[in-house]
Amino acid sequence: MRALGAVVTLLLWGQLFAVDLSNDAMDTADDSCPKPPEIENGYVEHLVRYRCQHYRLRTEGDGVYTLNSEKQWVNTAAGERLPECEAVCGKPKHPVDQVQRIIGGSLDAKGSFPWQAKMVSRHELITGATLISDQWLLTTAKNLFLNHSEDATSKDIAPTLKLYVGKMQPVEIEKVVIHPNRSVVDIGVIKLRQKVPVNERVMPICLPSKDYIAPGRMGYVSGWGRNANFRFTDRLKYVMLPVADQDSCMLHYEGSTVPEKEGSKSSVGVQPILNEHTFCAGMTKYQEDTCYGDAGSAFAIHDLEQDTWYAAGILSFDKSCSVAEYGVYVKVNSFLDWIQETMAKN
């Protein structure tokens, strides 16, 4: 029963430890584990195999360890070094499989967006964040600075945030890191105090190693933002949107290259940050769109060849709400080095 207890404990944290033991190895196990029968002119090896569930086995060998004469578990390639279970990304168990109709979007009842997190800032304002590993999330700098002064520091901001993953599971924030050029780069990362167990409802989305952005390319955006009645929804919603032509988007917003500001010449009254590190996504013919509170959510693109979902963008300008033609997203690929270096340093 001790072996069974190990399986249950590790499975709860997303890791499955499978053990195959026999003969002398059984002497160290519970009597309820039967010894395998012996065979003539042969022998039984004592082996253990490490496996992962919702995780990827990272090891120099094959994860199989043999009990040597010194009663040490060793692998032919890795020696005594144990393998690690690395969180799988971009592989939801129930991906969206059809064009369903975040204004009047569809409810996510299946857990198709396990990377979507809900962030609550000062004065209970709701925004989005995107899980990119089992301990890090991506969001916008504006989200992090909501209801904070311009001279607020990361240490000031972190304690004021509440974060939820999966089925509204609260997680503690250790620190936030904001891009040093946030006036034109609306991006920041959040480190959790502890790693979250990866499962069907909680799974990071993959970071892109290439640029997936091309006009007409379809992506999905999920979020907890305001609905058609301008009320924050208590159910996660999603919508499918096409990447828009950048020139058309810049013309729509008067080609702004500065942070959004009131009283601009834009037809919608505000100008988002638009530059070579951003892209736009337009509304579908059903008039579905993102709205206040959806910022920080991923523009998720499905790579059909790899059957993997990637965060091609992070929603920065979420105030279109079916009024403006386009939402604006930060290209994740443009800041991949900064994101990875920040996680490595911290």
Curated annotation (Swiss-Prot):
Organism: Mesocricetus auratus
SMART domains, sorted: Tryp_SPc
Sequence ranges assigned to domain Peptidase S1 in this UniProt record: 102-344
Oligomeric form and interacting partners: Tetramer of two alpha and two beta chains; disulfide-linked. The hemoglobin/haptoglobin complex is composed of a haptoglobin dimer bound to two hemoglobin alpha-beta dimers. Interacts with CD163. Interacts with ERGIC3.
PANTHER family linked: COMPLEMENT COMPONENT 1, S SUBCOMPONENT-RELATED, HAPTOGLOBIN-RELATED PROTEIN
Domain characteristics, as noted in the entry: The beta chain mediates most of the interactions with both subunits of hemoglobin, while the alpha chain forms the homodimeric interface.
Annotated tissue distribution: Expressed by the liver and secreted in plasma.
GO MF assignments: antioxidant activity; hemoglobin binding
Keyword Iron in annotation: no
UniProt similarity note: Belongs to the peptidase S1 family.
Name by which UniProt lists this protein: Haptoglobin
GO cellular component: a single term: blood microparticle
Disulfide feature: C52-C85, C89-C206, C249-C280, C291-C321
Gene name tied to this protein: HP
Pfam short name (any one): Trypsin
Subcellular location field: Secreted
One of the protein's GO biological processes: acute-phase response
UniProt entry keywords in alphabetical sequence: Acute phase, Antibiotic, Antimicrobial, Antioxidant, Disulfide bond, Glycoprotein, Hemoglobin-binding, Immunity, Secreted, Serine protease homolog, Signal, Sushi
Signal peptide annotation: 1-18
The keyword Ribosomal protein is assigned to this record: no
Segments for region (Interaction with CD163): 258-263
Biological function: As a result of hemolysis, hemoglobin is found to accumulate in the kidney and is secreted in the urine. Haptoglobin captures, and combines with free plasma hemoglobin to allow hepatic recycling of heme iron and to prevent kidney damage. Haptoglobin also acts as an antioxidant, has antibacterial activity and plays a role in modulating many aspects of the acute phase response. Hemoglobin/haptoglobin complexes are rapidly cleared by the macrophage CD163 scavenger receptor expressed on the surface of liver Kupfer cells through an endocytic lysosomal degradation pathway.
Glycosylated position list: N147, N181
Superkingdom of origin organism: Eukaryota
Residue ranges of every copy of the Sushi domain listed in the record: 31-87
